[in-house]
Amino acid sequence: MRWTLAAAASIVLGLGCGPADLGTAALRAFGNEPFWNVTVSDTAGIVYQRLGGEEVIFPYQAPRRSADDGTTLLFGPLRTGSGEHEIEMRVSEKGCQDTMADAVHPMRAVVILDGEELMGCARRLDDDPGAELP
């Protein structure tokens, strides 16, 4: 993943969604090397999955806004029902370029699963999956 000025500009031009819209929206965060994704839904919970791995399901908890900038949504820390896994996630309204998919996404995400930090992109599930790069 690489963050770019072009991706950030797409936010300013209105291609992204504002953080005010994210509190109730389903969203997906994802990254490469290792390939992983987190899907957030108030009905299905917060579901983490690594490519080829099993889903790890956390209870849904509405995000809160960071005190420092107000544009970053914070999820967690949350634990699975068994207490075996813990997740935290920060989603910010900063452009993100997925170089493997050659796509620009409106948000970036940092996920911490059981102490391992994963960085990637994010988008609302009802948004365009990403604008093509020129």
Place the predicted regions along the sequence by residue:
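Cysteine-centric segments in proteins
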Residues: 18-134
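C-terminal motif of bacterial Sec signal peptides marking the signal peptidase cleavage site
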Residues: 14-16
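Bacterial N-terminal signal peptides that target proteins for export
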Residues: 1-7
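Classic N-terminal secretory signal peptides
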Residues: 8-12
